[in-house]
Curated annotation (Swiss-Prot):
InterPro entries: Cell_div_FtsQ/DivIB_C (IPR005548), DivIB (IPR026580), FtsQ_DivIB (IPR050487), POTRA (IPR034746), POTRA_FtsQ_type (IPR013685). Residues 36-49, 60-70, 338-352 have a biased composition (Basic and acidic residues). This is Cell division protein DivIB. Signal peptide: none annotated. It holds the Pfam family POTRA_1. It comes from Streptococcus pyogenes serotype M2 (strain MGAS10270). One of its GO terms (biological process) is FtsZ-dependent cytokinesis. It is found in: Cell membrane. Residues 1-103 are cytoplasmic. GO terms for cellular component: cell division site; plasma membrane. The gene is divIB. It is a single-pass type II membrane protein. It comes from the Bacteria.
């Protein structure tokens, strides 16, 4: 029996390599677990210590803040003078820096002058390009020629003083009402032109001569070049033409467009009486001195006019026709003259009316005096 027990103990002591490694692995794992446990305990203790230290520091800071507040209050009450801060003085510049700053404007001016001088020597300083805007009767070549711009002129001269090139255009070309020479980079110049409008045409030999709104005449044009509707002035006196053109510019454009021609009526009583033919077939007689005052009434009267009517504005305003004016006037008899002189006597006036009733039917009555402008306007509105 004793031998059997010794054999069993010997079997227990003999271990394989794998068993030995396993035993070592378990021991190491146990040691690591114990070390991790110790580290956790140490970390917990450290955290507690840090928290306690932080609480203590906050308490100390609160105490120090209270002390500083109390000290500030005490300092305000005692009104102790504050310490002045030291002002930093700028560093002194050297003599060379001061001299450079003083000479810098002179250097820049000299460089600019040198650059301009070099540019003026080059051919680019005289190269110019032109264009025109707003023209209908003039072209670019005429404007350049009238402005007296030379190929040798510097474009800087045009930029600095454009007026000396604009004034000759206004004196030379009658079409131009205003002109402005504007500059565009790098060397382009634009003629901004405003032209006079054509108010009427004067009939001359082999054509028609346009009359501008300033009263000046320009080169004649052919009949094929005329617009569909235009106004013809058949007046010879240039002063009267210029005055009439100025008057027409003040009238409504719709009324002026309806005028076909204007000529002198050759009246013995009114020297400046004008005969105005309208495109609608009517004729207006009006003194030139009263044109702007009376002619606008035609716009209201024409609504009630028959075709080919005559509106006489020489004395007052009344309407008639050519047929009525062509009728011969019957001279008054001596009895009618006597009745006119003794119109205050009722008996004789009644006798004269009886005699008038016996006159032949083919005799026309004397011409009536024209009504006033107010009466005609009331009839037109009615």
């Amino acid at each position: 029996m004793a031998k059997d027990k010794e054999k069993q103990s010997d079997d227990k002591l003999v271990l394989t390599e794998w068993q030995k490694r396993n035993i070592e692995f378990l021991k190491k794992k146990k040691q690591q677990a114990e070390e991790e446990k110790k580290l956790k305990e140490k970390l917990l203790s450290d955290k507690k210590a840090q928290q306690q230290a932080q609480n203590a520091s906050e308490a100390v800071e609160l105490k120090t803040d209270e002390k500083t507040d109390s000290q500030e209050i005490e300092s305000e009450t005692t009104s102790k003078p504050k310490k002045t801060k030291k002002v930093r003085q700028p560093k002194e510049k050297s003599a060379t820096q001061i001299a450079f700053q003083k000479s810098l404007p002179v250097l820049l001016g000299a460089l600019l002058l040198m650059a301009v001088s070099i540019f003026m020597i080059t051919p680019y300083s005289k190269k110019k390009e032109f264009s025109v805007r707003g023209n209908h009767q003039t072209n670019l070549d005429e404007l350049i020629k009238a402005s007296k711009v030379k190929a040798s002129d510097y474009w800087l001269t045009l930029l600095i003083s454009p007026g000396q090139y604009e004034r000759p255009i206004l004196r030379t070309i009658p079409w131009v009402k205003s002109v402005h020479l504007s500059y565009h980079f790098p060397n382009h110049f634009l003629f901004n032109v405003i032209e006079f409008e054509i108010i009427a045409y004067a009939q001359v030999e082999n054509g028609f001569q346009p009359i501008l709104e300033n009263g000046k005449r320009v080169d004649k044009v052919r009949a094929s070049e005329l617009p569909k509707s235009f106004l013809i002035l058949n007046l010879k006196d240039e002063k009267a033409i210029q005055q009439l053109v100025k008057q027409l510019t003040t009238l409504p454009k719709k009324l002026v467009k309806n005028i076909k021609s204007v000529s002198l009526a050759n009246s013995k009583t009114t020297a400046d009486l004008l005969l105005i033919e309208m495109h609608d077939g009517n004729v207006v007689r009006v003194p030139q001195s009263q044109l702007t005052l009376k002619l606008p009434y035609y716009q209201k009267l024409k609504k009630n006019l028959e075709n080919d009517s005559i509106v006489d504005m020489e004395v007052g305003i009344y309407t008639t026709t050519q047929e009525i004016e062509n009728q011969p006037e019957v001279p008054l008899t001596p009895e009618q003259n006597a009745a006119d002189k003794e119109g205050d006597k009722p008996g004789e006036h009644q006798e004269q009316t009886d005699n008038d009733s016996e006159t032949p039917a083919n005799q026309s009555s004397p011409q009536q005096t024209p009504p006033s402008p107010e009466t005609v306007l009331e009839q037109a509105h009615g």
